[in-house]
A protein has these predicted regions:
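Rossmann-like NAD(P) dinucleotide-binding subdomain of oxidoreductase/dehydrogenase enzymes
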Residues: 132-279
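Glycine-rich loop-to-alpha-helix module at the N-terminal edge of alpha/beta enzyme cores
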Residues: 41-130, 141
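Hydrophobic face of amphipathic alpha-helices that form TPR/SEL1-like repeat modules
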Residues: 1-39
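Generic secondary-structure signature for well-ordered alpha-helical cores
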Residues: 63-67, 85-92, 103, 125-132, ...
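Residue-level signal for inorganic ion chemistry
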Residues: 40, 76, 98, 120, ...
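ALDH superfamily catalytic-core signature
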Residues: 199-202, 243-388, 412, 416, ...
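Conserved C-terminal structural/oligomerization subdomain of aldehyde/semialdehyde dehydrogenase
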Residues: 41-44, 209, 233, 270, ...
Length: 515
């Protein structure tokens, strides 16, 4: 594949300025080198933001908000529709770039762009349904209702594992709701951010929309802190590790600002004796090795009943033996590389912790040779048999390591094991028994934001709200009523009588005012 032609098709320079609000590209900060984990090649460099670049973008965004918020929501929906069409035109090239810069398989890269298209379609319909609620007033000749208004400037901080889709979840809903956006992409995938900004800028220019409605701000974690600390940023939507999310929450909370956090997951599949084992196997393998185990919703734990433990262990081992690892742009391969060598170091550290904490290896894993694979970022997926209370099991291991855990009793025991970790993003049960599945979905069942039956933990549709509980952050993005996080809520009471009755039946004698 000729990388330069791909970058040219997406309007990316090899030496690229990293800040943009719709006019000229700028950026005088630190240079960020983008290396492909596929073969270790240098794809390009992006010059990040200084504080002066940041202020320049923020000024543009604040000015743009004043005019953008008064555009009717269905008209803003038309802009999102056009963005979706641009993404359809660029789907293959953008999907290739995602695979090239991040390392996920081409099928997953294309799927990520399709997710962007889907959220645009969803948001277009939503633009005519930003409805409030009308309530019955206790006072005669009064009307009581709620409505929603735009927030202002929304700051988006995204992670490397979904370098384009998470941005689209935010910008599509934020636009529909009348907000403007400043996006700080991961410094590990800056070129994906450049490509998206070029695409969205075409839509804005063609519609003569003010500069500043969509801004790009490349840089390191220091740049993210600027967004989190700035009281002019009405909402900070941050996706990443729990450690990062705690820092963002602390900074935004210190100014009593709004934050939307989608953080780590330690996702489990419960497999009961009543499971369809073929379905369970497919869900477990894709969940564990898809995106090389670097999805927020990747399957980290399999909680399997003792009666089927040995049988499932055998078929799982056979399935892993058939996985093809290699260049993610080759559609024959199931799994590509980890994002970088730091991720490989964390993978090796986790394997050592498994050894020291009494685990054994069903599939031992290991780092693959650079000479055969093109970079130092390729690893083997691993499966460890380990106790549910081992410390490593309670951490989010952002790598293709699957922890195989046995339970002996009822489904309630399995649910308790699932819920004992600090994270609460995604969960799943494999069972054809209605009592087991309904228990799992009940208020005493899974404590996660996502609870699935007979599908895996990974691969959420955009129609549902996406997010989790506990150390996952509590925020919700994407579908359902997640749009409400991007608006300020207002309660209105209208009096169309000639009197001024007070709520709760309070009597206030004011007749003497007229004397």
């Amino acid at each position: 594949m000729e990388y330069k032609k791909l970058l040219q098709a997406l309007q990316i320079d090899i030496n690229q300025k990293g800040c943009h609000s719709g006019g000229e590209w700028h950026g005088e900060g630190k240079k960020i080198a983008s290396y492909s984990p596929v073969d270790g090649s240098l794809l390009g460099t992006v010059q990040g933001a200084t504080i002066e670049d940041y202020e320049r973008l923020l000024d543009k965004a604040e000015d743009a908000f004043e005019s953008f918020r008064i555009i009717p929501a269905p008209k803003r929906g038309e802009l999102v529709r056009q963005l979706g069409n641009k993404l359809r035109e660029k789907k293959f090239q953008l999907g290739q770039l995602v695979s090239l810069e991040m390392g996920k398989s081409l099928q997953e890269g294309l799927g990520e762009v399709q997710e962007m298209i889907d959220i645009c379609d969803f948001a277009v319909g939503l633009s005519r349904q930003l409805h409030g609620v009308t309530m019955t007033s206790e006072r005669p000749s009064h009307r009581l209702y709620e409505q929603y208004h735009p927030l202002g400037v929304v700051g988006v901080i995204s992670a490397f594992n979904f370098p384009v889709a998470v941005w689209s979840w935010n910008v599509a809903l934020a636009w529909i709701c009348g907000n403007v956006c400043i996006w700080k992409p991961s410094e590990k995938t800056p070129l994906c951010g450049i490509a998206c900004q070029q695409i969205i800028s075409e839509v804005l220019k063609e519609n003569k929309i003010s500069e500043g409605v969509s801004c790009l701000l490349n840089g390191d974690s220091e740049v993210g802190k600027w967004l989190a600390d700035d009281q002019r940023i009405a909402l900070v939507s941050a996706t990443g590790s729990t450690r990062m999310g705690k820092d963002v929450a602390k900074r935004v909370g210190a100014r009593l600002g709004k934050s939307l956090l989608e953080l780590g997951g330690n996702n489990a599949i419960i497999i009961t004796p009543n499971a369809d084992l073929d379905t369970a196997l497919m869900a477990a393998v894709f969940g564990a090795v898809g995106t090389c185990g670097q999805r927020c919703t990747s399957t980290r734990r399999l909680i399997v009943h003792k009666d089927i433990f040995e049988t499932f262990k055998d078929v799982l081992k056979k399935a892993y033996a058939q996985l093809r690892i290699g260049n993610p742009l080759d559609e024959k391969n199931h799994m590509g590389p980890l994002i970088d060598e730091d991720a490989v170091t964390m993978y090796n550290k986790a394997r050592k912790q498994v050894d020291s904490q009494g685990g054994s290896w069903l599939v031992p894993g290991g780092v693959l040779d650079k000479g055969s694979y093109g970079s130092n970022c390729y690893v083997k997926p691993a499966i460890a048999i380990i106790d549910h209370d081992a410390p490593i099991v309670h951490q989010e291991t952002f790598a293709p390591i699957l922890y195989l855990i046995q339970y002996e009793g009822s489904v309630e025991e399995a649910i308790a094991i699932q819920n004992e970790v600090k994270q609460g993003l995604s969960s799943s049960i494999m069972s054809l028994n209605m009592r087991e599945t309904e228990t799992f979905l009940s208020h005493w069942g899974s404590d996660c934001g996502i609870a699935n039956v007979n599908i895996g933990t990974s691969g959420a549709e955009i129609g549902g709200a996406f997010g989790g509980e506990k150390e996952t952050g509590g925020g919700r993005e994407s579908g359902s009523d997640a749009w409400k996080a991007y608006m300020r809520r207002q309660t209105n009471t209208l009096n169309f009588s000639k009197e001024l009755p007070l709520a709760q039946g309070i009597v206030f004698d004011y007749k003497f005012f007229n004397n």
